UniProtKB/Swiss-Prot annotation:
Keywords, alphabetical: Actin-binding, Allergen, Cytoplasm, Cytoskeleton
MF terms in GO: actin monomer binding
Main location: cytoplasm
Family according to the record: Belongs to the profilin family.
Organism: Malus domestica (Apple)
One Pfam family this sequence matches: Profilin
Location(s), subcellular: Cytoplasm, Cytoskeleton
Protein name per Swiss-Prot or TrEMBL: Profilin-1
Entry GO CC: cell cortex; cytoskeleton
Function: Binds to actin and affects the structure of the cytoskeleton. At high concentrations, profilin prevents the polymerization of actin, whereas it enhances it at low concentrations. By binding to PIP2, it inhibits the formation of IP3 and DG.
Protein backbone atom coordinates (compact mmCIF):
# COMPACT_ATOMS: atom_id res chain seq x y z
CA UNK A 1 0.00 0.00 0.00
CA UNK A 2 1.38 3.43 -0.90
CA UNK A 3 1.70 6.18 1.69
CA UNK A 4 -0.94 8.16 -0.20
CA UNK A 5 -3.33 5.21 0.07
CA UNK A 6 -2.86 5.21 3.86
CA UNK A 7 -3.88 8.88 3.92
CA UNK A 8 -6.78 8.45 1.49
CA UNK A 9 -8.14 5.13 2.80
CA UNK A 10 -7.19 5.03 6.50
CA UNK A 11 -7.10 8.69 7.57
CA UNK A 12 -9.61 10.44 5.29
CA UNK A 13 -12.08 7.55 5.70
CA UNK A 14 -15.81 8.03 6.20
CA UNK A 15 -17.07 7.98 9.80
CA UNK A 16 -20.83 8.31 10.17
CA UNK A 17 -20.93 10.42 7.01
CA UNK A 18 -18.05 12.68 8.07
CA UNK A 19 -14.26 12.65 7.73
CA UNK A 20 -11.15 14.48 8.87
CA UNK A 21 -10.63 17.98 7.52
CA UNK A 22 -7.01 17.16 6.62
CA UNK A 23 -4.42 14.45 7.20
CA UNK A 24 -0.79 13.67 6.46
CA UNK A 25 2.08 11.31 7.13
CA UNK A 26 5.47 13.00 7.55
CA UNK A 27 8.94 11.75 8.33
CA UNK A 28 10.54 12.82 11.61
CA UNK A 29 12.59 15.31 9.56
CA UNK A 30 9.42 17.00 8.28
CA UNK A 31 9.54 15.43 4.83
CA UNK A 32 6.05 14.82 3.46
CA UNK A 33 5.37 11.16 2.68
CA UNK A 34 1.71 11.73 1.78
CA UNK A 35 -1.02 14.25 2.53
CA UNK A 36 -4.60 15.19 1.76
CA UNK A 37 -5.08 18.11 -0.60
CA UNK A 38 -6.41 20.11 2.37
CA UNK A 39 -3.37 19.63 4.63
CA UNK A 40 -1.92 23.05 5.51
CA UNK A 41 1.46 24.21 4.24
CA UNK A 42 3.58 24.11 7.37
CA UNK A 43 6.90 25.65 8.36
CA UNK A 44 9.89 23.40 9.16
CA UNK A 45 10.17 24.97 12.62
CA UNK A 46 6.61 23.86 13.40
CA UNK A 47 7.60 20.22 12.86
CA UNK A 48 10.83 20.75 14.83
CA UNK A 49 8.76 22.05 17.77
CA UNK A 50 6.40 19.06 17.55
CA UNK A 51 9.36 16.63 17.52
CA UNK A 52 10.84 18.45 20.53
CA UNK A 53 7.58 17.94 22.45
CA UNK A 54 7.80 14.20 21.81
CA UNK A 55 11.32 14.25 23.31
CA UNK A 56 10.42 16.73 26.06
CA UNK A 57 6.67 16.31 26.78
CA UNK A 58 5.07 19.59 27.80
CA UNK A 59 7.44 21.84 25.84
CA UNK A 60 4.60 22.96 23.52
CA UNK A 61 2.15 23.72 26.34
CA UNK A 62 3.27 27.35 26.95
CA UNK A 63 3.31 28.36 23.26
CA UNK A 64 0.75 26.01 21.73
CA UNK A 65 1.11 23.67 18.77
CA UNK A 66 1.45 25.57 15.50
CA UNK A 67 0.68 23.94 12.16
CA UNK A 68 0.36 25.90 8.95
CA UNK A 69 0.23 29.10 10.99
CA UNK A 70 -2.76 27.89 13.04
CA UNK A 71 -2.26 27.79 16.79
CA UNK A 72 -3.78 24.91 18.74
CA UNK A 73 -3.97 24.78 22.53
CA UNK A 74 -2.16 21.61 23.63
CA UNK A 75 -4.42 19.30 25.63
CA UNK A 76 -3.69 16.03 27.37
CA UNK A 77 -1.93 13.54 25.14
CA UNK A 78 0.41 10.64 25.79
CA UNK A 79 3.94 11.82 26.54
CA UNK A 80 6.34 10.78 23.80
CA UNK A 81 3.59 9.11 21.74
CA UNK A 82 0.59 11.40 21.03
CA UNK A 83 0.10 15.17 21.02
CA UNK A 84 -3.42 16.58 20.92
CA UNK A 85 -4.41 20.17 20.19
CA UNK A 86 -7.70 22.06 20.29
CA UNK A 87 -8.86 25.21 18.53
CA UNK A 88 -12.49 26.25 18.71
CA UNK A 89 -14.72 23.42 17.50
CA UNK A 90 -11.82 21.51 15.96
CA UNK A 91 -8.36 20.28 16.67
CA UNK A 92 -5.41 18.11 15.73
CA UNK A 93 -3.97 14.75 16.77
CA UNK A 94 -0.33 13.82 16.07
CA UNK A 95 0.89 10.24 16.61
CA UNK A 96 4.61 9.48 16.54
CA UNK A 97 5.81 6.13 15.19
CA UNK A 98 9.36 4.85 14.84
CA UNK A 99 9.89 6.73 11.57
CA UNK A 100 6.80 8.87 10.97
CA UNK A 101 4.38 11.46 12.31
CA UNK A 102 0.70 10.80 11.56
CA UNK A 103 -1.46 13.95 11.54
CA UNK A 104 -5.22 14.30 11.63
CA UNK A 105 -7.05 17.64 11.68
CA UNK A 106 -10.78 17.78 12.38
CA UNK A 107 -13.75 20.13 12.74
CA UNK A 108 -17.19 19.43 14.17
CA UNK A 109 -19.30 17.37 13.70
CA UNK A 110 -16.32 14.98 13.96
CA UNK A 111 -15.37 14.58 17.62
CA UNK A 112 -11.91 14.67 19.21
CA UNK A 113 -12.35 11.00 20.12
CA UNK A 114 -13.06 10.04 16.52
CA UNK A 115 -9.97 11.91 15.29
CA UNK A 116 -7.84 10.29 17.99
CA UNK A 117 -9.13 6.84 17.05
CA UNK A 118 -8.41 7.28 13.33
CA UNK A 119 -4.90 8.72 13.80
CA UNK A 120 -3.80 6.47 16.65
CA UNK A 121 -5.12 3.31 14.99
CA UNK A 122 -2.99 3.94 11.89
CA UNK A 123 -0.03 4.99 14.03
CA UNK A 124 -0.25 1.79 16.09
CA UNK A 125 -0.48 -0.27 12.88
CA UNK A 126 2.66 1.41 11.48
CA UNK A 127 4.49 0.78 14.77
CA UNK A 128 3.49 -2.91 14.57
CA UNK A 129 4.95 -2.95 11.03
CA UNK A 130 8.26 -1.58 12.30
CA UNK A 131 7.65 1.85 10.81
Amino acid sequence: MSWQAYVDDRLMCDIDGHHLTAAAILGHDGSVWAHSSTFPKFKPEEITAIMKDFDEPGSLAPTGLHLGGTKYMVIQGEGGAVIRGKKGSGGVTVKKTGQALVFGIYEEPLTPGQCNMIVERLGDYLIDQGL
